[in-house]
Amino acid sequence: MKNLVVVDHPLIKHKLTIMRDKNTGPKEFRELLREITLLLAYEATRHLKCEEVEVETPITKTIGYRINDKDIVVVPILRAGLVMADGILELLPNASVGHIGIYRDPETLQAVEYYAKLPPLNDDKEVFLLDPMLATGVSSIKAIEILKENGAKKITLVALIAAPEGVEAVEKKYEDVKIYVAALDERLNDHGYIIPGLGDAGDRLFRTK
């Protein structure tokens, strides 16, 4: 798992434990997902380049640094990735936002695309793909395929929880994609859910079950 980074931080561990609790309601669940995404983004954006700029303080002129966040694209996988987008956009408010709609067929466990709306992509764009659960990896792989078909070259996948099977599947298909997660869990069960995981993130976010 050479491309995997597990962001080890006390705040993330604390907040993720509350999210795992089956008694945590949707309002708190949404807030925690947004907060953890913000913390993950701190590490996932570490490779971004800064440009020198001159700035005038109340005392004197000096050299500072700015990120050109207009070259950054945030792409949540619908539905559950939407809340993650809110977290990363707090740090990068000028980033472009695309959306990819994918669901996992419960019988075949294959990814089915139902929507894609993306801003212009090219070699210079830094794309952050957001999906809370990296389980089998099929949804993330499908989303990366769509991004690459539309011109994306620099893609970083940010997830809340991953299973080893999902990480290995993404790495096998796309060696150039870095993966940042809050936790690497034990395994998948027979239904493709992460163990111990936190259940279906979308259902818990939007109370659809």
Curated annotation (Swiss-Prot):
Query: Which cofactors must be present for this protein to function?
Result: Mg(2+)
The main enzyme category here is transferase
- Please list the residues that bind uracil: 194, 199-201
Characterize the regulation of its activity: Allosterically activated by GTP.
Q: List the disulfide bonds.
A: none
SUPFAM superfamilies reported for this sequence: PRTase-like
Q: Name one GO molecular function term.
A: uracil phosphoribosyltransferase activity
Q: Name one GO biological process term.
A: UMP salvage
**The entry's keywords:** Allosteric enzyme, Glycosyltransferase, GTP-binding, Magnesium, Nucleotide-binding, Transferase
- CDD domains, A to Z: PRTases_typeI (cd06223)
Against NCBIfam families, the record matches this protein to: PRK00129.1 (NF001097), upp (TIGR01091)
Q: What is this protein called?
A: Uracil phosphoribosyltransferase
Please tell me the species this chain comes from. Answer: Thermotoga maritima (strain ATCC 43589 / DSM 3109 / JCM 10099 / NBRC 100826 / MSB8)
Taxon lineage? Bacteria, Thermotogati, Thermotogota, Thermotogae, Thermotogales
